[in-house]
């Protein structure tokens, strides 16, 4: 039988068989891959004419052209290639000569598997065998006689294999040359193509090429390229091999060639997994991007073929059934390129002996190394392939979930890095791992016989489990570092690419919709199954497995990391065994809010990650039973022993799939792990890994019962909170199962939203109450209630003490003090001071300052969220009265002078995450405070929590911890707190203590994730997966479970308590403004989410009760906030609700009023700063007008609003409409009250009221969210208003605009700028924030301007009422929905808006100076033209325009000089200028008067410049403090900065927080609010000052 094979023989001698089909030639993803840069990605096409048996080449319009015989062929036109034509693609160094090999395929060859592979599906199996078994290959190719034929084929194939220019096909083409190779060999034997080595060429090349083809098909299942060709070459199947490899039927199918055309070779893009030569393991068609790695044992010749053949069959079968198992290309594997450009693959080709970069399998150093590794190359190849495969396709692995633990210890030596996947299958296949892991024998076995497993293949799966366990243990810190080492490979695999992780997370979520909490809950599920298997043994056995081959494991981990990184889809494990690396990663994680401390990362992540995967799956597939069994076992386990078992057992499930894997998508899970460890779900998940799996389970199950029993939801809570000790035994199986399904998420989601949340919250509160004295509402303790009070679950909650925050997770049985301190972090008892709250995300750690912790304010300091994000508390506990510093994001850090404490954070890098954290922390804080209060009320241990309960009640203040601390203690007396405590305990207990941590963390994580989503940049690594999962969760109807009707539902879906609170402001959070929103909003939301939880879990009455309680606690306006939020979300009419909501949401308002103005200003100002931009963000949804009005009060709310925009754009829209309606109504009605409240009262009080009112009238608007949700934000807003007199005044006025009477307020506020002196520190803070904001805002302003250039003006008009700054961010959003309002207020809006970006304050000050009507944005409707008139009259357009131009010029000169003076801030200048310019671009007025617009633009520019100057000159705001009065000069800007920075500060924080996180959503508003508020504020203040002057 003769067949014609056409080859392109490169000048280097490499031969590339041309398949009888169209192939692409190019640099990427092409069958013939050339490495020359002159070759386009898709350069040319070579087609085949079956009738004429000739090939055509067509240049695909490549840049450098395609040359045939040195003649450039026309583009897009087929040119027939003749024999011996010289083809050159681009300027590739290789010239290809077209050669035709007429090879007669001997019968033997026809019988050869290569030919057979196409005919028989078993070819695939054969291929691996063959590759592995040279003997097979030899008989296969008849090394002696057929070898010439096959040799010919082989040379081509070989060249194709290692040198295949074709993307993947060259490999399989060359391999298919197995069929054509004989031809090539006969005819082209002379060709150096075969230089690789005759023997290897013969058997190996041939053998594994041919088999690889089928394999490629089967593995890839992508016959698109290769299966089509399979028909071409009927490869005579080699009877012996085919039967053996019937499994690779797919391959045969793919090959499909059957014994028809001999030349089919490429027909089935065969993946050459030559066990002997990994380099050879090329999928001819690159089809095996993952399969490439499958079988390329370096240097493996056919010698071990027989053994390999068996293994290969298995591996091939696995690969066929699990593409994820396909080999990954080894270092020596160069399947992608022809290696035409050697330098590209210098490293890869290092071992290649030939100039062209080709090398025979025998020459593959990696292969040889692998063979030398001591593992049979075949076994090694197979294992490597499996490992690679596992590693390769985490998602596929997830789906395929084949439990392959490939022993790479011995074989890994050469290919360890490439074959680290021994953990892949477990990690890659968490399900498989789970399934496997759940097997007691597996779990236990791996633990005990880990070494054996490491050594033996049979122990592979077990080892995978054990490794997982080890990893978990490592994370937990229970196993020795060595044990951690083995775990890491799994972690790596488990980590999977974020994509895979996200995918898995999503799949898991989808698989267990009911287990929506599953992401967090699932981990427990998985742990349960895993642990049950090794339940008792898991604890003890795990350590042995971890130690197993520690170095090997470590090496593998490193190698695996390498391979994972090479794959690019795998995220590097953070659970590095390397202490330094771990610490560095920990720091990074912490900075990014991931807070994956070694314990968290390892225990939580590892345990957690696979759990999520497996948990969901298991819950789907019956993991529930295992889970229940596991939980029961845990329950039965001794607490002391349980933790280890949990460490090992729980982490094991997650270990393979990964700690990072979960970490990423499950920042949720992680956060839930981190705090959740503390929490009941996390306790199980993260805590278990820490060493209290049983405890964790217990905590989780019974936690809520007693509290829930207390509240209407009590029964359900108890039922759900199986974790609690009381119900642990009885309910643990079912409860734990349910909770594992629901709790993990509920943990992260405050375990309230899904019915499973309720119990968690209830459980946590119950535990908190029980342990209140010791743990208070510490998530760790609360969740671990089953644990001895003193027995901390190390991984429970990464709220480690300052000293042991990271240790906590690691300490399986951390000292009670440590655990407690951590636990009490939530409940700022003395231990709490040291504790840090780690959001369920693991992203935010709320650090309760020990200093605060001492309850200086009693209840007020109870809730120290000084560092929303830091694991370790801030440098020093702030004064009890001082607000805990939430230096979650750089703005805050800068603001506080980065407040030494804040500086403790590693949040600078995690700017956005920190913002999220702020938001989440605010929510968490409020929750924890309320829960702490509840716990105190119930446990009486922590009086502060009751005080904070107020804060918790009005999470607004919680959002602004400061406001929470100082204001809430007073305004929200303990009386409401007990009610709230009960309310929160039952509805938001999850959010309160442990659940609060989890819920808040979950809310935070979700808010952070949602915010993060828009905010992609900061949390890109883990944040993104987290974001995705959070978003998935958010969009999943978890919160919806509680409030399905809510538009907020999607977000709420996953956060019952925290999510409800976060979900209510979830959009803001999602937008990234939600962080503040979360913080600000949670005070009210915790009850609301709690209430919703109650609703979902217990009953409407429960919710009503908490709401009623919240209502009773007028100071903490959680229920109205919640109700308003719900209304807004559901009905979009927050107007009436907001009135109460504004008041309630203005928890901070009374609070701020109660507080010293300066303190309020400072606390609120910083929070305001953070919150205001959030408000703005909210505005982006187009709810700006009403929102803007309260935006001042609730910048954060606004920010939240914008965040909400992502989550509830529709709601935002509805709200925007509602706001318009409400604004019109409220503008007349509430606005006057606002005016009164604000004008008559102290700025704070007025602001508070205005905030309340603003919230009221903006109840429809997202700002209402902010106001309701973020009382602190409102407080902050009003503080901002007070603090940033011009801006705050503007804000006030802006609000006033919403409430017409506010105009008076504007007047009142006008003097306030001087009153800002009191808030000097705050102003300095604001100045710092404004600096940061200026940078961020500059960028954001540009983006916003680009996005909403004109919208800003519109937004401004709406926000104008709410202070251009405050509303500006929200204005753009608001602008969208409130354009009608804008129309009404256009004159003022335009002025305001123009003021907002460049002179939000400036314009305001200017307005105040010229006309208080500048603030009439609120009163815009009342006197929309007044402002214009005032502007016209005051500016006297021409003179004003000239003046503004002169001012602008002078300001620019000054800015230039300042830039020179502050060159180190040049970048900041540029950024600021860019942002400012972008803002200036924003249409200032919707005024027909172009002169006014130009003036406004000029002034805006001036404002921007001044802001830049202010930021540069006085980044710390110290000058602002010195400058009590507004100055025209840049120095005055700091003075103005007080007012301006203060005024600007709220937008600034919002800007940084909302803008950065929600920049995408709020681009326009942010620019308006962020850029202009932060930049324009100083600028505007100076401008305003100038005008005033």
From Swiss-Prot:
Residues 23-73 form the FHA domain. Residues 147-156, 243-253, 330-344, 430-446, 467-476 have a biased composition (Basic and acidic residues). Signal peptide: none annotated. One of its GO terms (cellular component) is cytoplasm. Residues 520-530, 538-548 have a biased composition (Pro residues). It comes from the Eukaryota. Keywords: Cytoplasm, Cytoskeleton, Microtubule, Phosphoprotein. Residues 1029-1038 have a biased composition (Basic residues). Residues 130-261, 287-309, 325-388, 409-583, 598-895, 934-1316, 1350-1374, 1532-1552 are annotated as: Disordered. Residues 957-972, 1221-1230, 1363-1374 have a biased composition (Polar residues). CDD domains: FHA_Cep170B (cd22725). The modification Phosphothreonine is found at residues 542, 1304. PROSITE patterns: FHA_DOMAIN. It is found in: Cytoplasm, Cytoskeleton. Plays a role in microtubule organization. Belongs to the CEP170 family. This is Centrosomal protein of 170 kDa protein B. The lineage of its organism: Eukaryota, Metazoa, Chordata, Craniata, Vertebrata. The gene is CEP170B.
């Amino acid at each position: 039988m003769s067949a014609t094979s056409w080859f392109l023989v490169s000048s280097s001698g490499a031969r590339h068989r041309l398949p009888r089909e169209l192939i692409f030639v190019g640099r990427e993803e092409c069958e013939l891959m050339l490495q020359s840069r002159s070759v386009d990605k898709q350069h040319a096409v070579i087609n085949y004419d079956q009738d004429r048996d000739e090939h055509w080449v067509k240049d695909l319009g490549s840049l450098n052209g395609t040359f045939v015989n040195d003649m450039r062929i026309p583009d897009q036109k087929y040119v027939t290639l003749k024999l011996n034509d010289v083809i050159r693609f681009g300027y590739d160094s290789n010239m290809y000569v077209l050669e035709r090999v007429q090879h007669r395929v001997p019968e033997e060859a026809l019988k050869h598997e290569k030919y057979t592979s196409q005919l028989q599906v078993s070819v695939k199996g054969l291929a691996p065998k063959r590759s592995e078994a040279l003997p097979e290959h030899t008989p296969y190719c008849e090394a002696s006689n057929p070898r010439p034929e096959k040799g010919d084929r082989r040379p081509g194939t070989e060249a194709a294999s290692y040198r295949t220019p074709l993307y993947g096909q060259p490999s399989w083409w060359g391999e298919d040359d197995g069929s054509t190779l004989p031809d090539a060999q006969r005819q082209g034997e002379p060709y150096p193509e075969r230089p690789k080595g005759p023997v290897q060429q013969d058997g190996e090349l041939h053998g594994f090429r041919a088999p690889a083809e089928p394999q490629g098909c089967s593995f890839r299942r992508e016959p698109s390229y290769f299966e089509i060709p399979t028909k071409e070459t009927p490869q005579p199947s080699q009877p012996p091999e085919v039967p053996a490899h019937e499994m690779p039927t797919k391959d045969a199918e793919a090959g499909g060639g059957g014994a028809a055309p001999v030349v089919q070779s490429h027909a089935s893009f065969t993946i050459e997994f030559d066990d002997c030569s990994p380099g050879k393991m090329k999928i001819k068609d690159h089809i095996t991007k993952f399969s490439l790695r499958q079988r390329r044992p370096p240097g493996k010749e056919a010698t071990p073929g027989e053994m390999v053949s068996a293994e290969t069959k298995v591996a091939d079968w696995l690969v066929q059934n699990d593409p994820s198992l396909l080999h990954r290309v080894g270092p020596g594997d160069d399947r992608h390129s022809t290696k035409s450009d050697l330098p590209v693959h210098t490293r890869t080709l290092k071992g290649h002996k030939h100039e062209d970069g080709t090398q025979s399998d025998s020459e593959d150093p990696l292969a040889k190394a692998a063979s030398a590794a001591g593992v049979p190359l075949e076994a090694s190849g197979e294992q490597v392939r499996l490992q690679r495969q596992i590693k390769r396709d985490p998602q596929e692995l997830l789906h395929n979930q084949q439990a392959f633990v490939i022993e790479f210890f011995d074989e890994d030596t050469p290919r360890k890095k490439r074959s680290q996947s021994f953990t892949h299958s477990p990690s890659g296949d968490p399900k498989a791992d789970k399934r496997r892991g759940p097997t007691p024998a597996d779990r236990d076995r791996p633990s005990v016989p880990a070494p054996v497993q490491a050594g033996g293949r049979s122990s592979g799966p077990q080892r995978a489990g054990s490794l997982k366990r080890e990893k978990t243990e490592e994370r937990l810190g229970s196993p020795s570092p060595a044990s951690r080492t083995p775990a890491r490979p799994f972690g790596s695999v488990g980590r999977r690419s974020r994509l895979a992780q996200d995918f898995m997370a999503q799949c898991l979520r989808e698989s267990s919709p009911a287990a929506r909490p599953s992401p967090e809950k699932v981990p427990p599920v998985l742990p349960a199954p895993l642990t049950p298997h090794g339940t008792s043994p898991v604890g003890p056995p795990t350590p042995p497995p971890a130690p197993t081959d520690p170095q090997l494991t470590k090496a593998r981990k490193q190698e695996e990391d390498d391979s994972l990184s090479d794959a690019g889809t795998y995220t590097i494990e953070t659970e590095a065994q390397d202490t330094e690396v771990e610490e560095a990663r920990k720091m990074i994680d912490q900075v990014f809010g991931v807070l994956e401390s070694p314990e968290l990362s390892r225990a939580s992540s590892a345990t957690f990650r696979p759990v999520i995967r497996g948990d969901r799956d298991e819950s789907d597939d019956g993991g529930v039973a295992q889970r229940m069994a596991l939980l029961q076992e845990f329950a039965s386990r001794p607490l002391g022993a349980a933790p280890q078992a949990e460490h090992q057992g729980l982490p094991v499930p997650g270990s393979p799939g990964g700690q990072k894997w979960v970490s990423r998508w499950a920042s949720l899970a992680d956060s839930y792990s981190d705090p959740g460890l503390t929490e009941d779900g996390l306790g199980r998940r993260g805590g278990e890994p820490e060493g209290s799996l049983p405890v964790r389970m217990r905590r989780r199950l019974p936690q809520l019962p007693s509290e829930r029993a207390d509240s209407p939801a009590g029964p359900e809570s108890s039922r759900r909170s199986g974790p609690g000790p009381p119900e642990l035994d009885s309910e643990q199986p079912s409860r734990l199962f349910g909770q594992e399904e629901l709790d993990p998420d509920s943990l992260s989601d405050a375990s309230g939203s899904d019915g499973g949340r309720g119990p968690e919250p209830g459980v946590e509160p119950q535990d908190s109450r029980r342990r209140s004295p010791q743990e208070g509402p510490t998530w760790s303790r609360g969740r671990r209630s089953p644990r001895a009070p003193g027995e901390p679950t190390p991984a429970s909650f990464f709220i480690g003490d300052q000293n042991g925050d990271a240790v906590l997770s690691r300490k399986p049985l951390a000292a009670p003090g440590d655990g407690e301190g951590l636990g009490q972090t939530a409940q700022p008892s003395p231990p709490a001071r040291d504790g840090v709250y780690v959001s369920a995300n693991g992203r935010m750690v709320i650090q309760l300052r020990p200093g605060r912790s001492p309850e200086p304010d009693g209840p007020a300091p109870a809730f120290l969220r000084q560092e929303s994000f830091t694991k370790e508390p801030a440098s020093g506990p702030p004064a009890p009265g001082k607000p805990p510093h939430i230096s979650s994001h750089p703005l805050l850090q800068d603001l506080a002078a980065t407040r030494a404490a804040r500086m403790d954070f590693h949040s600078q890098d995690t700017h956005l995450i920190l913002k999220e954290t702020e938001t989440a922390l605010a929510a968490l804080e409020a929750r924890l405070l309320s829960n702490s209060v509840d716990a105190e009320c119930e446990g009486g241990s922590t009086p502060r929590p009751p005080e904070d309960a107020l804060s918790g009640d009005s999470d607004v203040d919680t959002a602004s911890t400061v406001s929470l601390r100082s204001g809430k203690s007073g305004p929200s007396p303990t009386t409401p707190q007990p009610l709230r405590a009960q309310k929160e305990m039952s509805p938001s207990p999850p959010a309160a203590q442990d659940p609060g941590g989890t819920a808040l963390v979950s809310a935070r994580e979700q808010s952070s994730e949602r915010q993060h989503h828009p905010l992609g940049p900061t949390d890109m690594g883990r944040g993104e997966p987290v974001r995705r999962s959070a978003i998935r969760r958010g969009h999943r109807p978890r919160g919806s479970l509680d409030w399905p009707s809510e538009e907020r539902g999607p977000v709420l879906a996953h956060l019952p308590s925290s999510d409800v609170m976060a979900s209510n402001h979830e959009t803001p959070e999602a937008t990234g403004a939600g962080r503040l929103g979360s913080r600000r909003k949670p005070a009210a939301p915790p009850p609301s989410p709690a209430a919703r939880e109650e609703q979902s879990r217990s009953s409407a009455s429960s919710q009503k009760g908490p709401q009623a309680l919240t209502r009773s606690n007028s100071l903490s306006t959680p229920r109205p906030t919640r109700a308003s939020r719900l209304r807004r979300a559901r009905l979009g009419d927050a107007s009436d609700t907001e009135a109460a909501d504004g008041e309630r949401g203005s928890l901070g308002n009374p609070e701020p009023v109660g507080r010293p103005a300066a303190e309020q200003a400072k606390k609120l100002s910083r929070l305001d700063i953070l919150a205001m931009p959030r408000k703005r963000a909210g505005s982006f949804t187009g709810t700006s007008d009403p929102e803007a009005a309260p935006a001042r009060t609730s910048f954060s709310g606004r920010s939240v609003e914008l965040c909400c925009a992502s989550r509830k754009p529709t709601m935002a829209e509805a709200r925007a409409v509602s706001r318009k309606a409400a604004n019109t109504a409220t503008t007349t009605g509430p606005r006057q009250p606002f005016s009164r409240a604000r004008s008559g009262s102290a700025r704070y009080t007025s602001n508070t009221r205005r905030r309340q009112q603003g919230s009221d009238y903006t109840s429809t608007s997202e700002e209402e969210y902010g106001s309701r949700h973020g009382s602190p934000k409102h407080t902050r807003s009003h503080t901002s208003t007070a603090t940033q007199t011009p801006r705050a005044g503007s804000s006030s006025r802006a609000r006033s605009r919403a409430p017409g009477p506010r105009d008076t307020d504007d007047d009142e506020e006008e003097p306030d700028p001087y009153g800002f002196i009191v808030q000097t520190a705050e102003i300095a803070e604001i100045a710092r924030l404004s600096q940061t904001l200026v940078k961020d805002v500059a960028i954001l302003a540009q983006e916003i301007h680009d996005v909403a250039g004109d919208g800003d003006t519109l937004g401004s008009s709406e926000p104008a009422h709410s202070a251009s700054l405050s509303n500006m961010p929200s204005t753009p959003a608001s602008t969208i929905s409130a354009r009608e309002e804008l129309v009404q207020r256009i004159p003022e809006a335009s002025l305001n808006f123009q003021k907002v970006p460049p002179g939000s304050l400036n314009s305001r000050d200017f307005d105040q100076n010229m006309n208080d009507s500048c603030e009439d944005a609120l009163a815009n409707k009342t006197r929309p033209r007044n402002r214009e008139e005032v502007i016209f009259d005051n500016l006297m357009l021409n003179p004003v325009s000239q003046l503004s131009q002169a001012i602008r010029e002078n300001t620019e000169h000054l800015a230039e000089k300042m830039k020179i003076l502050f060159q180190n801030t040049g970048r900041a200048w540029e950024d600021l200028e860019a942002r400012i310019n972008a803002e200036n671009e924003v249409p200032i007025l919707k005024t027909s008067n172009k002169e006014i617009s130009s003036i406004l633009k000029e002034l805006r520019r001036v404002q921007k410049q001044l802001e830049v100057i202010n930021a540069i000159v006085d980044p710390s705001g110290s000058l602002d403090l010195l400058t009590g009065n507004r100055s025209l000069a840049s120095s005055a800007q700091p003075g103005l900065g007080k007012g301006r920075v203060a005024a600007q500060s709220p937008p600034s924080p919002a800007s940084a927080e909302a803008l950065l996180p929600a920049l995408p959503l709020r681009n326009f508003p942010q620019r308006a609010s962020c850029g202009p508020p932060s930049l324009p504020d100083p600028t505007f203040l100076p401008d305003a000052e100038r005008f005033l002057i």
